[in-house]
Amino acid sequence: MTDEIGIVTPQKLHVSTPLEMVSGSTLPEYDLAYETYGSLNADKSNAILICHALSGNHHVAGQYEGESTRGWWDGYIGPGKPIDTNRFFVVCSNNLGGCHGSTGPASINPLTGKVYGPDFPIVTCKDWVHSQNTLRQHLEIDAWAAVIGGSMGGMQVLQWTIDFPDQIRHAIVIASAPKLSAQNIAFNEVARRAIMTDPDFHDGRFIEAGTTPKRGLALARMLGHLTYLSDDMMGSKFGRELREGKLNYNFDVEFQVESYLRYQGEKFATKQNFDANTYLLMTKALDYFDPAADFDDDLSKALSGATAKFLIISFTTDWRFSPERSHEIVKALLDNDADISYAEVNSQHGHDAFLLPNDHYEGVFRAYMKRIHAELNHTSLQEGE
């Protein structure tokens, strides 16, 4: 039986120890916004870390007081759900460089007394994982029972297995890739140019100028959203349906798919109030992710020290991070005789499928989480039901 997580309150960890970053820059101090769900058991062995994707944040489940919107993965986290909060203590933090409570471009730079803006240092998946490890230490958790993430979150999971192999028992990598393709880097560059050429961007100092590059953000989101959807899904959802039932022979919105994309862009740029500099940072972190680069471009070698057990999930119509990209990860793990489970899930929803309801996906996910719970309690899967 499933139930819902109720009202949640975000927490904040202030870290006064400087963070040495991959770029060579240093954050003198920083805040990490995070949320937790469920209860930590006596030996603190049931903790799960969720790593979010590009536009995500730490609000992964439940809802805030006075708000109706639920967390971005609420369908999969809660009592009786695949990530069962009756069994697990779930943690999710907002990535550094974000705009939802963790230190980012809109935060005050303690060295200048002004907002960081474009001066915020470039962040990488490795930087995020090292800050998340600081949160782990703060929570006095010896090791995560599992680290779980989809898309960019899956990249962080892989980085965890490389940088902190003794602190992660299971790694669940969903709809992800070991590095971006040239095409994906190109999509990110077009999105960045849309933002940076908006007259309201002001070289990233738009907060000081009292503006917001909404047009650029909306265009970037429209492009990104296109890559998250499959052709089949767009065809079945919109086809060539006209908004007014007839052609008007002008450049206003005529097709329903145009209306949908404009709505998604405007919502992201206005209602969600996403910081433009954060968007630039997140896309760059995606571009830079390539753990094999430090191991002679050999992914098998990069993952050779990983001791976690793995679940890798891909989706048939995901062309942003196609199943073939997951196969690369699977092969590298098999080269190392890793304990690995793999599922390729049928879905018409493209890359966004990892966020949406799907019986096959949920079944695989639920079964694997039951396995983790059974291992924690030293029981068989039947006893661990």
From Swiss-Prot:
Broadest EC class assigned to this enzyme: transferase
Domain of life: Bacteria
Catalytic reactions of this protein: L-homoserine + succinyl-CoA = O-succinyl-L-homoserine + CoA
A Pfam family recorded for this sequence: Abhydrolase_1
Major localization listed first in the record, in broad terms: cytoplasm
Start and end residues of each AB hydrolase-1 domain: 46-355
Cellular-component GO terms for this entry: cytoplasm
Pathway annotation: Amino-acid biosynthesis; L-methionine biosynthesis via de novo pathway; O-succinyl-L-homoserine from L-homoserine: step 1/1
Example GO molecular function: homoserine O-succinyltransferase activity
Site (Important for acyl-CoA specificity) residue list: 320
This protein's name: Homoserine O-succinyltransferase
Lineage: Bacteria, Pseudomonadati, Pseudomonadota, Gammaproteobacteria, Thiotrichales
Gene this chain is encoded by: metXS
